[in-house]
Regions:
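Alpha-helical transmembrane segments of multi-pass integral membrane proteins
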Residues: 2-243
């Protein structure tokens, strides 16, 4: 190349089959993080579910019924696969992250099952058992919100149908946050399928489990608003697609 020749542009490199250099700076790191996360979603999900199944057999608990468990395993497995692909291909679309996040919350149940195993075999929890049963007190609310509220609201392009849907997203989001925080701070943590209790190291004394609070019905209001809004958003998008 002589001094008078210009360097090929990015579009010319692409047309010639020369790969473009990855973006530099924060954007490049963000894309790298998205690719790594996309590759990890499916393995983490399936390893977590296998651990859950093994632990359930160890303590003699079947958890959900066979059909319900299979539907849960396959359904959120699809979430993990599709979510990972979307995160890899369209990292700017929140739908992929929602699918991935919801799928990775399901194996959190393995932590509570481990706690049940420890309590039935040793009678005293170790730190991992405490973390597991603590996460069990709030993770399902977040998982349900991601899968049944925010996914329908933002599907498929990662945007709300219009700005008028913003209050629905905000109200349901605040409601979920309050429920999750109250679940994190409950005084006593308890088993799901095995009867045991563990003291919450960060719990507020006297604060009951979130579902037993006298005002839980009030807290359920924002979640109901979110679910109804999610269904309405799907209907609106379907009608728009049909003209």
């Amino acid at each position: 190349m002589t001094s008078h020749e210009e360097a090929p542009t990015e579009s010319e490199n692409t047309a010639a089959g020369t790969p473009e250099a990855p973006p530099a700076g924060p954007l490049g790191w963000a894309l790298l993080f998205a690719r790594v996360a996309a590759w990890l979603v499916v393995p983490i999900y399936f390893v977590g579910m296998v651990v859950l199944i093994i632990l359930e057999r160890r303590i003699g608990s079947s958890g959900e019924g066979l059909v319900e468990g299979l539907v849960l395993f396959v359904g959120f497995g699809v979430f993990a696969v599709v979510g990972g692909l979307l995160v890899a291909k369209r990292p700017g679309n929140p739908v992929g992250w929602i699918l991935s996040g919801a799928s990775l919350l399901v194996p959190v149940a393995a932590g509570e099952t481990y706690a049940a195993y420890v309590m039935t075999t040793r009678g005293e929890p170790d730190w991992l058992a405490v973390v597991g049963v603590w996460a069990n007190s709030w993770y399902w609310f977040m998982c349900v919100a991601l899968a049944f509220i925010f996914l329908p609201l933002l599907f498929p392009d990662g945007r709300l149908p219009s700005r008028r849907w913003l209050p629905v997203a905000v109200i349901s989001g605040v409601g979920v946050l309050i429920v999750v925080v109250l679940g994190m701070l409950s005084d006593t943590l308890r088993g799901q399928n095995v009867d045991y209790t563990v003291e919450n190291p960060i719990g507020i004394e006297g604060l009951a489990h979130v579902e037993e609070l006298p005002f839980f019905a009030v807290l359920s209001g924002p979640l109901l608003v979110g679910c109804l809004g999610a269904v309405a958003a799907v209907v609106v998008r379907f009608r728009r697609s049909r003209g």
